[in-house]
Amino acid sequence: SDLWVQKMKTYFNRIDFDKDGAITRKDFESMATRFAKESEMKPEHAKVLMDSLTGVWDKFLANVAGGKGIDQATFISSMKEKVKDPNAKAVVEGPLPLFFRAVDTNEDNMISRDEYGIFFNMLGLNPDMAPASFDAIDTNNDGLLSQEEFVTAGSDFFINDQDSPNKVFWGPLV
């Protein structure tokens, strides 16, 4: 769907950390490093996050890249095929609990509105955009995101090609 393509363009934009128009393993490494540093993540958690994010590259994208970066059009066509894989949901969900841990800076097993603003800041987005996304994925409207809500929203972003509140998980669509 056009919406799914727009979501993939949004994600591509968020993970192209060096903004060179291509995603590489280095972008995933940079994302993990920034999240670990800005959330003051414990070293053992930082290693798991790094392994998980580079694992997304290794499992999903390295064969597409062929030793170089992946441009947006190639990324989108590859993801169209990848999400059809029966293991896609598990691979997509893999790093999400680690992102959750990175964003849950006070380690209370919930993400507050303020902590979600930190998530947006880590992605290079204006934290002022976070409340609208937060409210959209706070499915039980308790003002907090559980790990289940966070992982479900993040996974749905990639897997679901229909309109849903989770389309704003990675921020406003580009």
Curated annotation (Swiss-Prot):
Transmembrane segments: none annotated. The keyword Repeat applies. SUPFAM superfamilies: EF-hand. Residues 3-38, 55-90, 91-126, 125-160 form the EF-hand domain. The keyword Translocase does not apply. Keywords: Acetylation, Calcium, Metal-binding, Muscle protein, Repeat. The modification N-acetylserine is found at residue 1. Like parvalbumins, SCPs seem to be more abundant in fast contracting muscles, but no functional relationship can be established from this distribution. This is Sarcoplasmic calcium-binding protein. It comes from Perinereis vancaurica tetradentata (Sandworm).
